[in-house]
């Protein structure tokens, strides 16, 4: 018989740096999950993606065990890394803060493909381009 699910928790955590401090501790604590167990597993699985924010969906079962699924980093985080900037523009339609190449957009789209509801890489590229536009990043090429 399958375990009964009692909760789904969605968090965005820095790769390899999950600690029992908020937001992890309170979110898992209210469901009675072993917080240190989650932190160690998460950090072990994300150690190669250092410096990125990783969304994670944690499923908590009735016997207080858990499983989690790692998602791809948000498009905005990948775009900021590709452009080499700390944050997007406050007024994206007036102030452009950086440029990325079409090749970089394609690479990000291919990375995000598993989490996007796009049927092709071209469609995913348009989604990423829209995110870039709303951040004040121009696309060359």
Swiss-Prot record:
Subunit structure comment from the entry: Part of the ribosomal stalk of the 50S ribosomal subunit. Interacts with L10 and the large rRNA to form the base of the stalk. L10 forms an elongated spine to which L12 dimers bind in a sequential fashion forming a multimeric L10(L12)X complex.
The protein's name in its UniProt record: Large ribosomal subunit protein uL11
One cellular-component annotation, GO: cytosolic large ribosomal subunit
Listed HAMAP family: Ribosomal_uL11
Organism placement in taxonomy: Bacteria, Bacillati, Bacillota, Clostridia, Eubacteriales
Keyword Amino-acid biosynthesis (UniProt): no
Keywords in alphabetical order: Methylation, Ribonucleoprotein, Ribosomal protein, RNA-binding, rRNA-binding
Processing after translation: One or more lysine residues are methylated.
Family per similarity comment: Belongs to the universal ribosomal protein uL11 family.
GO function term, MF aspect, one: large ribosomal subunit rRNA binding
Domain of life: Bacteria
One GO BP: translation
Signal peptide per UniProt: none
């Amino acid at each position: 018989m399958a375990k009964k699910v009692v909760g789904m928790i969605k968090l965005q955590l820095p790769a390899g740096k999950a600690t029992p401090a908020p937001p992890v501790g309170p979110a898992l604590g209210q469901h009675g999950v072993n917080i240190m167990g989650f932190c160690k597993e998460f950090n072990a699985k994300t150690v190669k993606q250092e410096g990125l924010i990783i969304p994670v969906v944690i499923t908590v079962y009735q016997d207080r065990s858990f499983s989690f699924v790692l998602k791809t980093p948000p498009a905005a985080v990948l775009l900021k890394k590709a452009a080499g900037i700390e944050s997007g523009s406050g007024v994206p339609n007036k102030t452009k803060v950086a440029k990325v190449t079409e090749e970089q957009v394609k690479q990000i789209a291919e990375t995000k493909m598993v989490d996007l509801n796009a049927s092709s890489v071209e469609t995913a590229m348009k989604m990423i381009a829209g995110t870039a536009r709303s951040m004040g990043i121009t696309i060359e090429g």
